[in-house]
């Protein structure tokens, strides 16, 4: 999809760059595949802020996405491509031959009227879902499972994909966009193609208010706070902080490694760049 620029008839339109969504479905989502979603404002069950800079934003309906693709050997036709406010990628409404509807992540170049299927015998075609052991090396994939039957977890964001680079000893080796090489069981499923909306990385919201519509509050710098609020706070005049960058709780930030999960490190062949 292309990007839209606007004539600067107001200050907020001068820098605004949006993804052109004119080709997407303009109606409401399918009611049976939606449910309400409540806002947390970044607070946990004790009312304390656990995720900073969240709050407000437009009301949303959650679209129930099928990440598992468990309807095996049943063909489905793409009814429409839709916008989803809960994720960066677009979604596709598909209708199976038995009449059931489902939402899936829409890959690039998937069009209305295309047929998709989840099967070990499916063609290597955009939108089809297969176990990794039936997919040829060199194929571009998205929505890749990490545990058999759990549903896709890798490459679900706009424009993302992974490459299948090898198979050996019951595992497939995939290359992620981060440069990481990872092992995934060959029985895990993946979908052919790259995720839609690759131009999202080039958008410019143009004004602070659009960030508020999306549920993001202002991000205050530590050096602009008082000493009681942040290790970088205080000082006379514009002080630069006086120490290496740290979080509000004093832990190093800006590049400090934070990964703690040693249990799955054995599946990482090469760390990300």
Swiss-Prot record:
What Gene Ontology terms describe what this protein does at the molecular function level? rRNA binding; structural constituent of ribosome; transferase activity
A GO cellular component annotated for this chain's UniProt record is: large ribosomal subunit
Keyword rRNA-binding part of the UniProt annotation: yes
Give the keywords, sorted.
Ribonucleoprotein, Ribosomal protein, RNA-binding, rRNA-binding
One biological process term in Gene Ontology:
translation
The family database entries (SMART domains) matched by this protein are listed as: Ribosomal_L2, Ribosomal_L2_C
One Pfam family hit: Ribosomal_L2_C
Q: Would the keyword Kinase turn up in this protein's UniProt record? A: no
InterPro entries, sorted: NA-bd_OB-fold, Rib_uL2_dom2, Ribosomal_uL2, Ribosomal_uL2_bac/org-type, Ribosomal_uL2_C, Ribosomal_uL2_CS, Ribosomal_uL2_dom3, Ribosomal_uL2_RNA-bd_dom
Bias (Basic residues): 254-273
Disordered: region residues? 228-273
- List the PROSITE patterns: RIBOSOMAL_L2
Q: Which HAMAP family is this protein grouped with?
A: Ribosomal_uL2_B
Q: What does this protein do?
A: One of the primary rRNA binding proteins. Required for association of the 30S and 50S subunits to form the 70S ribosome, for tRNA binding and peptide bond formation. It has been suggested to have peptidyltransferase activity; this is somewhat controversial. Makes several contacts with the 16S rRNA in the 70S ribosome.
Q: How does it assemble?
A: Part of the 50S ribosomal subunit. Forms a bridge to the 30S subunit in the 70S ribosome.
Q: Member of which family?
A: Belongs to the universal ribosomal protein uL2 family.
**Protein's UniProt name:** Large ribosomal subunit protein uL2
Q: Which organism is it from?
A: Rickettsia akari (strain Hartford)
UniProt lineage: Bacteria, Pseudomonadati, Pseudomonadota, Alphaproteobacteria, Rickettsiales
Gene coding for it = rplB
């Amino acid at each position: 999809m292309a990007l839209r620029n606007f004539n600067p008839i107001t200050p907020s339109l001068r820098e605004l760059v949006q993804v052109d969504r004119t080709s997407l479905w303009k109606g409401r989502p399918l009611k049976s595949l939606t449910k309400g979603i409540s806002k947390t404002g970044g607070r946990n069950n004790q009312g304390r802020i656990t995720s900073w800079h969240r709050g407000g934003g437009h009301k949303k309906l959650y679209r129930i996405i099928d990440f598992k693709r468990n309807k095996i050997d049943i063909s489905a036709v793409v009814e429409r491509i839709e916008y989803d406010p809960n994720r960066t990628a677009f979604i596709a409404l598909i209708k199976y031959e038995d009449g059931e509807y489902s939402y899936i992540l829409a890959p690039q170049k998937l069009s209305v009227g295309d047929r998709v299927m989840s099967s070990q015998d499916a063609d290597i075609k955009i939108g089809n879902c297969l176990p990794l052991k039936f997919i040829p090396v060199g194929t571009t994939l998205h929505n890749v499972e990490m545990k058999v039957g759990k549903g896709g977890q890798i490459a679900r964001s706009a424009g993302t994909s992974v490459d299948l680079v090898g198979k050996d000893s019951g595992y497939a080796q995939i290359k992620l966009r981060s440069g990481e090489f990872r092992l995934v069981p060959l029985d895990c499923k993946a979908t052919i193609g790259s995720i839609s909306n690759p131009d999202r990385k080039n958008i410019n919201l143009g004004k602070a208010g659009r960030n508020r519509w999306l549920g993001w509050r202002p991000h205050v710098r530590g050096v602009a706070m008082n000493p009681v609020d942040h290790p970088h706070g205080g000082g006379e005049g514009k002080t630069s902080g006086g120490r290496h960058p740290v979080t509000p709780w004093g832990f190093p930030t800006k590049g400090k490694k934070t990964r703690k999960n040693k249990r799955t490190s054995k599946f990482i062949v090469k760390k990300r760049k």
